Amino acid sequence: MNRRGFLRSAAGAGLALGAGLPSLGAGLAGLGAGPNLSRVEARHYVKLPDREIECRLCPRLCRLGDKERGYCGVRENIGGTYYTLVYGKVCSLNIDPIEKKPFFHVLPGTSALSLATAGCNVNCKFCQNWEISQARPEQVEAFDLAPETAAARAAASGCPSIAYTYTEPTVYFEYMYDTAVRARRRGVRSIVVTGGHINPEPLAELLGVVDAVKVDLKGFSEEFYTEYVRGSLKPVLETIRAVARSKVWLEIVVLVIPTLNDRMDLIRDMSRWIRDEAGKEVPVHFTRFQPMYLVKNLPPTPVSTLEAARRIALEEGLRYVYVGNVPGHESENTYCPGCGKVIIARVGYAIEAVRLKKGKCESCGTPIPGIWA
């Protein structure tokens, strides 16, 4: 069953598209419901003869005729001009702990104004937000939130950052970019949670206006990406390299799924690659899988598997390796690589202690990389 079919069957079974989503709660209070679709000209595409276009935003390079949409479902060719249909059309808006993203080396203990529009340029069979990521914009309730309004709302709410999250922010590139520009003017940082399927040119443009990027490295084989992500590993690795070489902070998350991507030889290869291509100080999070969407036949990841993955990554020289989605686990903490003491103590999303002084371990003075202020 494809993603559209799954949505249709869910609707037929009486499941609301909003069920199970991150709560809209008070985040959307005061925002007016607008027309479901925007019509703002997209960036990163070329016009072709006969009113065709080719999208250059992500590696799919969708070539589209008049009135056709890209794979993401949120960008449409109308008369030979390509438009984003979700500019300022927010379907999820919350204030989250930054640790939920997860970012562990960015402003610990603070909150991020977290937003999303509909759409995604891959189709992960284990997606936790499939109701909005795999929907077209007409299928979700959206509210108008202009870039300047989003930036002002973050500042007024005491959020030092805006997170582009929940779905795939690449597909609302224009909105994310413009919001990040306005947020920076107000002293609000921008953090991106992405699967990494973006072409080099738009990525370079984005890296000029955001502060941190978390890449979901969903596996370490093309076979896994083809079967379970409907994407490709190669562009994700290229994205990680590019972010690591920029001035933007990088963290990596690996969702470890039993029997699908939990081979320890691949974990070792992945850890070596991260060490060599992104650097030993890039934080890596091995997180626990929960049955979701189209992969409900597998159990949650054993904690012992996550611990083994972390142990291998440390053996290969990575300095900051975490176990995620296991609240209370000791490997949620940040340990100083110099003296071994806990420098950031966490329980779930809560921060119990931060033992840093000007970005250095209070005990031994070892510099700890990250965005601390």
Question: Which residue stretches match the model-derived regions?
Answer:
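Conserved AdoMet/S-adenosylmethionine-binding subsite of the radical SAM
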Residues: 144-304
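Short cysteine-rich clusters marking metal-coordination/redox-active sites
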Residues: 55, 124, 336-339, 361-364
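N-terminal secretory signal peptides and thylakoid transit peptides that target proteins
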Residues: 1-14
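Short linker/helix segments within small regulatory modules
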Residues: 349-356
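Extended interfacial segments that mediate partner engagement and assembly in macromolecular machines
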Residues: 82-170, 176
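Short Cys/His-rich "knuckle" micro-motifs
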Residues: 65-68, 135-136, 346-349, 371-373
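N-terminal [4Fe-4S]-dependent radical SAM core
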Residues: 31-54, 60-116, 131, 342-344
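Bacterial Sec-dependent signal peptides at the C-terminal "C-region" and cleavage site
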Residues: 19-35
